[in-house]
């Protein structure tokens, strides 16, 4: 499963171009991090095109066989914690 995370301090936000492509009114609109449209934009245009000010959005791939996942955040910097076969991992 692919998920979009912010990998810098500051916070998750979109560029004006990404907002327009996604039909969002605000750079700070919350959408599912595994939204197919968002994943497609990241794959087609890349992080710099999609990321807003003070954001460095990245595409993270976690195993499809994970049984649970959760996003962890500190001051805008995010990571995914997920479970596979009863073991915890992070990305």
Language-model features and meaning:
Residues 1-91:
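Catalytic phosphate/metal-binding cores of nucleic-acid and nucleotide-processing enzymes, i.e., regions
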């Amino acid at each position: 499963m692919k998920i979009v995370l912010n990998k810098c301090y500051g916070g998750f936000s979109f560029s004006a171009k990404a907002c327009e492509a996604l039909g969002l009114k605000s750079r700070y609109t919350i959408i599912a991090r595994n939204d197919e449209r968002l994943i497609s934009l990241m794959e087609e245009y890349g992080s710099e095109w999609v990321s807003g000010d003070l954001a460095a959005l990245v595409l993270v791939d976690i195993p499809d066989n994970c049984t649970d996942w959760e996003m962890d955040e500190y001051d805008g910097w995010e990571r995914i914690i997920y479970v596979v076969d009863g073991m915890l991992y992070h990305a």
